[in-house]
From Swiss-Prot:
One GO-annotated biological process of the protein: defense response
Description of the deletion phenotype: Suppressor of sni1 mutation symptoms including the accumulation of DNA damage leading to a constitutively activated DNA damage responses (DDR) and increased basal expression of pathogenesis-related (PR) genes.
Family of the protein in this entry: Belongs to the rad17/RAD24 family.
Listed GO CC annotations: nucleus
Pfam families: Rad17 (PF03215)
Keywords: ATP-binding, Cell cycle, DNA damage, Nucleotide-binding, Nucleus, Plant defense
Residues where ATP binds: 139-146
DNA damage listed as a keyword: yes
Compartment(s) where it occurs, according to its Swiss-Prot or TrEMBL record: Nucleus
Protein's UniProt name: Cell cycle checkpoint protein RAD17
Keyword Nucleotide-binding: yes
Biased composition range(s): Acidic residues: 581-599
Amino acid sequence: MLKKKLSLEDEDDDRSYNLRSSRSNAKSKPRSSAGTATNPRASKRARLSGASATQEDSSLVDKIRLSFEDFDEALSGFKVSSGYERSKNTDLWVDKYRPRTLEELSVHKKKVDEVKLWFQESLDFLKNGLRNNVLLVTGQAGVGKSATIHLITSILGVTVHEWNAPIPTIWQEHVHNTSSGLKYTSKLDEFENFVESTRKYGVMASSSTDGIKAPVVLLIDDLPLANGRHAFERLQNCLLLLVKSTQIPTVILITDHNNADSSDQTARRMEDTQSSLERAGALKVAFNPITKNSIKKVLQRICREEHCKVTTMEIDQMATASGGDIRHAITSLQLFSVKPELNHTKIKSPRPGMEDNYHGNEQTMYSGLDSGISSCFGRDETLSLFHALGKFLHNKRETDNVIISECSSSLVHDEFARLPLKMDAPEKVLSQAHGQAGRVVDFLHENVLDFVSDGAIEDAWCVSSYLADADLLLADIRGKMSGHNNTEDVPQSAGASVAVRGVLYGNKQPCSSRWHVIRKPKLWQVEQSSIQTKKNLREQRNISYEGSRVADISVMATEYSPVLKWLSYRASPDAFPGMGEETDEEDSDISEDDEIQDW
């Protein structure tokens, strides 16, 4: 007992122990010879129970040391799968096989030449007087925007100063900084400070061994996230200021949103930002998605270098599932090569009801590959808003034989029976298209009559009835910003579902398949005009009454505005030369209408 107490006191005094040495000492200790099948958790409980009488600090030390012992015991029984034949190199293939020459770039040669020509002209603008210092490169993710810029600058010997986005602040760090008295600075604020310092002081050019300063290019690859209209206006003003005042060649990379998200406010605001930068003098070069054949060539080259056991059909399916994103395709290939036996098992198992013709039908094999690869490593299936609208408006259905076999035992009247649709459930299509309820209904209102046969008056009446019901469900969001108009709310989801299913159900005699142009809803123009008119009335009310709310907008529009216009005309008739004549013409028109009504 005395020895045990002395040993515990020694452990108490030794506060500066090394956890790594404790771990290695724990490994070197021999196992107990009491039995060959000793339970490690039982021994852990025994050791902990033996140390329960010690002081609190010694107990914590023992727990940490014993946790390392258990971790070592778990690692001793871990074995690497024999099916994993890859090397121990953990480098990402995206970085390992990045292009090092212009020939290795998968970007279209015309786009590369445009970027290279801009660099050559902007670097010697002092000779030819060019002042186009900003290049705007757009395109979806993984089309080689940054790779092209870095490769061309390295070939031309240009030093790239890149804007490095700050590390995001987690909530615990924010709480700690707030308690310490540090003020939180958003990423947008830091970007504005960076642009301001770049405008004022520029960037330092590095000198070569010969003492000649290398040309400098500023690269902005990761714009801060702007959430909301006010934040977007700040970001847009900051970029416009940079375009108008920068003295060094500047490249701004903007990643376009997917077409499936085209109905989002963020996508439209980014398009407005790009247009404003072009008007300010920036040169825009839009990168297209990488072609399927180019992606397949890159994947085949990587397979030869890495000795991957991937078939040509699998490479073709990966290239198709990438959607023009070469970075996504290379990452999918690397993930696919980690456990090839599991991936092949998933791919070779056809869907139910397809066993008979799976091996004989190549299209079925591709669908099996799609279900295997896309579910594991591919993107979630998405649709553009116009693709979804095309499915709803064209209303393609199966043949007559299907309805007889499936609905022969049902009690549905022939008048209400419909053929099965050649698509998924309408709600699933809406979710894949990220369609906002109000926008979907507006598009259907504007374009549905073009897809109804000329003599199908009852179909047009039925479709209009369902669309009216959808308008009733969506009445609360009319006139609001579309950022609050989403399909997550129950009334909006119900309204979108009623509108879509009403169009599909009511149009029994759709027009034959031909080219149709989807028109933009005219209602949007009316709403924008209404919003602008209300804004002008608010400004006029604030100016006239010094900000005091003396009248509602409707009262301003119906009473005060006509009176103010009439008073302005009485005060200075020359300012409104045609007002009196227009009034006389209006009176004559009204009198003629009255005569027609009396007759």
